[in-house]
Amino acid sequence: ISGNEGSNNISVRGSNQWGNLILLDEAMVYNPNHALSFFSVFNNDAIQQVSLYKSYFPLKYGGRTSSVIDVKMREGNNQEKHRSATIGVIASKIQLEGPIKKGKTSYLVAGRFAYPGAVLNVLKQFRGTKMSFYDVNAKINSTLNDRNRIFFSVYNGGDHTFFNQLVRG
């Protein structure tokens, strides 16, 4: 497994990024990157587990030649409510989770808004650059019995990028 400098894409056994199957809660992710491939679309506050299969991956993942990255979202706390928020230099996040029906059904909502363009504007050659992106993950999870559960998972994200003419010197 290798990566490329200045990019979030990975290469497994020499393949390009299209040789990898990337899933989020069993749904295919076609572009796992934000902001010209510098940032991942996966908000770590919403992720429970990541499984990487480099070879001999299970048949249910067929259709790709290189690897499978299977990402599972957290299910939310089904016992009590939790809230958190962070404000950072290039990103801010919020997370809400709790029970809908205690012990049985839960929800999770995690959002992230990043503004790396604010940092780029400090550099003379990037003045006037506008770059931001957002992610929202939401999930409702319900345990039907000891062997079965049902869930509804949503991801929404977007990028906003504008490069003013680069200043040289």
Can you annotate each of these PLM segments?
Residues 30, 115-117, 158-160:
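Feature marks short, surface-exposed loop/turn motifs that line or immediately flank catalytic pockets
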